[in-house]
Design a protein with these regions (language model features):
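Perimembrane helix-loop-helix junctions
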Residues: 3-5, 191, 195, 218-245
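Loop-to-helix entry region of an early transmembrane alpha helix in multi-pass inner-membrane enzymes
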Residues: 100-112, 116, 124-142
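Short acidic/glycine- and proline-prone juxtamembrane loop motifs at membrane-interface regions
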Residues: 172-182, 342-343
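Transmembrane-helix signature of polytopic, membrane-embedded enzymes
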Residues: 130, 147-168, 184-185, 201
Length: 372
């Protein structure tokens, strides 16, 4: 009996060819079309700020890049000229006042490795705004390669993996304006290396992931605790690495950002005009309100379907149990700490669950003696 995909990673059967073609087509599509949200100008501003210190020059270069490179349909929204809302008035004020614009940059500078990735792509000759699409698309290609490799290692169905590439959750990462795709690439690569390459490589990638998104330090700590408990990492080494993981977001927030209280207040309560002089206020009552809103958003998303797949994969694919458990714990902890539910924040959970489901599909097919 022959199954697709076969176990050998270099044996390009029909499913592998389809997967490769689909990856290339989607990669080109994601290079051409990015969401370009209102965060675009702040990320571009942070790249400019690596080379220029004058707030006026930073504002001018950032908005010039947006108006000349971004699709015409999204430019009015980024500038705040399309609506009469409070949020739009803030965007207009940022555009008009370079010093006010500069006050918003620290909210986005706390993803330093992502900013450096944009800068590297820009130095290669790509426009400032287009660099965002390139980093997201390249991250997609990396994730697609890891998914294919992992599914093969598990003896899973590459046909099912083809479906994964077409999901809205994958598109959100591949077309997103921000570090989410790159963040999941580091986390997924680290997780895969822990089990199927070398733990040292996996730990290195996980440590680096915190410089893409600081909250990834939570996942790194969970992985280090697992390795220490399994005897794969000496206790003293685990303690040192956990300390580094914990100190990383502290160091990032010390040199950039306004702190957690300001972030919570900015996200869940206010749209402040001048965050540099804004006094944040966030109470327990505010947190509970945000938590209830986050739960409602989660219940109206695809999360429930993925949780069912997560439970199924946990039961049917023994080799994926610890990766699934670590991703589940990480996602739960992240939601409790920061209950702003957006699918892009939980990309790792979605992808690892889907990889487990690809293996579960093949295991059920094999148990019923069906050739795929």
């Amino acid at each position: 009996m022959v199954y697709f995909p076969v176990a050998h990673p270099y044996d390009m059967k029909a499913s592998g060819v389809v997967y490769l073609v689909l990856t290339v087509v989607l990669f080109i599509h994601f290079l051409r079309y990015n969401n370009y949200t209102t965060d675009t100008v702040e990320f571009v501003g942070n790249v400019v700020a690596l080379h220029v210190s004058d707030p006026v020059a930073i504002r001018d270069l950032a908005y010039r890049a947006v108006t000349t490179e971004a699709p015409a349909m999204v430019v009015p929204h980024i500038l705040g000229t399309d609506l009469a809302t409070e949020e739009a008035s803030v965007r207009r004020a940022k555009h008009a006042d370079p010093y006010r614009f500069a006050q918003f940059l620290p909210y986005f500078s706390v993803k330093p490795l992502y900013i450096e990735a944009l800068n590297l792509v820009h130095k290669a000759g790509v426009g400032l705004v287009r660099s965002i699409a390139v980093v997201s698309a390249v991250s997609f290609a990396g994730m697609a390669a890891l998914i294919y490799w992992w599914v093969l290692k598990l003896g899973g169905s590459v046909w099912a993996a083809c479906v994964l590439l077409l999901t809205p959750e994958m598109s959100a990462l591949a077309q997103g304006t921000g570090p989410d795709g790159l963040s999941v690439l580091f986390l997924l690569g680290g997780l895969f290396c822990l089990w199927d390459v070398r733990p040292s490589v996996g730990v290195t990638l996980l440590l680096l992931s915190a410089w893409v998104r600081p909250e990834n330090a939570i996942f790194c700590i969970l992985a280090l605790l697992y390795l220490a408990a399994k005897g794969q990492l000496r206790v003293w080494m685990a303690v040192v690495l956990i300390g580094i993981s914990a100190l990383t977001p502290m160091a990032i927030n010390h040199f950039g950002g306004y702190g957690w209280k300001a972030l919570y207040s900015h996200t869940f309560k206010f749209t402040e005009m001048e965050p540099g002089i804004f006094v944040p206020a966030f109470t327990v009552s505010d947190y509970l309100h945000a938590l209830r809103s986050g739960v409602r958003e989660a219940l109206h998303s695809s999360l429930i379907a993925y949780l069912l797949l997560w439970i199924t994969s946990l039961r049917l694919v023994p080799r994926m149990r610890w990766p699934l458990l670590l991703c589940g714990l990480f996602s739960a902890a992240k939601f409790v700490i920061y209950p702003n539910f957006e699918p892009r924040y939980y990309g790792l959970l979605y992808l690892v669950t889907a990889i487990g489901a690809c293996a579960a599909v093949q295991s059920k097919v094999a148990s019923h003696g069906v050739t795929t």
